[in-house]
A protein has these predicted regions:
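Short amphipathic alpha-helical segments with coiled-coil-like heptad repeat character
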Residues: 39-40, 100-104, 127-128
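A structural signal for well-ordered alpha-helical segments within the folded catalytic domains
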Residues: 59-63, 118, 125
């Protein structure tokens, strides 16, 4: 079995902002980025109508998926990480104590009102 993962295109969001599961729209470069993605898919000889395609329910993912195929399955488990209180905040606005704890415990640190990397990975593994 071969697996291919696509990440969504660029988003309408400031640089250095944690956006996680916030349902942001794609940037104005969407069409150009889709052309590049389709070219890469062609290089792998993938017929998107004859394979199973899964998408996160976030609109940035659905929008890209709709340009590739009409037949896809939406799965909540492949959403971005839940960044809780860090959603839509710049790194500079995250309390130093939380940043330090995050840096020292990358796997187990749970973002306040969000999820830890460990929880995120467990969710993704349940998809696979």
């Amino acid at each position: 079995m071969r697996l291919f993962f696509l990440r969504h295109t660029s988003l309408k969001v400031e640089i250095d902002v944690f956006y996680g599961q916030t349902d942001l729209d794609v940037s104005d470069n969407f069409e150009e980025e889709v052309i590049l993605i389709k070219k890469k898919i062609l290089n792998f000889n993938i017929d998107t109508d004859s394979i199973k395609v899964y998408s996160s329910p976030l609109k940035r993912c659905i929008k890209l998926t709709n340009t590739l195929t009409e037949n896809y399955i939406i799965d909540e488990r492949i959403k971005e990480m839940n960044l809780g209180d860090w959603e839509m905040k710049k790194m500079t606005s995250i309390p130093e104590r939380e940043k330090l704890e995050w840096e020292n415990n990358l796997l187990s640190f749970k973002i306040p009102n969000g999820e830890s990397n460990e929880e995120f990975l467990k969710r993704l593994k349940s998809f696979l």
